[in-house]
């Protein structure tokens, strides 16, 4: 069955396209692994990271995340802070129209708390973000993560929470 599928691709000349022509064999997709989560390359208002609860994989159209020794839910929940938002503005590339793009090395440099404690539960973050309440998540995580766990005062992070509006 697989052989017939490959032969059909060759009849349709899929193997002559650029992506397939540089592979050996042409039908083998490189670097396929199941990540813990995904980070979107192009962002508008905030660097979105999502948990890979379905066990899916992807090509290079979206960044794949691997959490090492830490629950991915904690990593992702802790990225929903003004610190990460400001970091994305500094690390990313702006292509105009409000779109910011993060290449792999830029995404790896995004700042987030070193101690992954106390952020809102990811299920709650997900519900609020889907309801269009990203600001509520950022405000609550600012209180929990930046103030309570990192020890910053409100004055310390108030310039950070305004950075996306300033840039």
Each language-model region and where it sits:
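Polybasic, glycine- and aromatic-enriched phosphate-binding surface used to engage nucleic acids
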Residues: 1-127, 131, 137, 144-145
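In a subset of proteins, long, contiguous C-terminal domains/tails are tracked
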Residues: 129-167
């Amino acid at each position: 069955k697989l052989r017939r599928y490959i032969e059909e691709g060759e009849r349709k000349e899929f193997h002559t396209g650029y992506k397939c022509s540089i592979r050996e064999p042409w039908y083998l997709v490189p670097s396929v692994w199941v990540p813990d989560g995904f980070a979107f390359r192009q962002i508008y208002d905030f660097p979105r990271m999502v948990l890979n609860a379905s066990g899916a994989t992807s090509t290079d159209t979206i960044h794949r995340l691997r959490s090492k020794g830490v629950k991915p839910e904690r990593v992702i929940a802790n990225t929903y802070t003004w610190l990460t938002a400001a970091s994305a503005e500094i690390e990313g590339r702006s292509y105009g129209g409000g779109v910011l793009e993060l290449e792999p090395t830029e995404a790896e440099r995004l700042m987030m708390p070193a101690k992954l404690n106390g952020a809102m539960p990811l299920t709650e973050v997900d519900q609020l973000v889907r309801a269009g309440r990203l600001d509520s998540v950022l405000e609550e995580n600012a209180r929990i993560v930046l103030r309570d766990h990192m020890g910053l005062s409100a004055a310390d992070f108030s310039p950070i929470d305004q950075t996306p509006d300033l840039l």
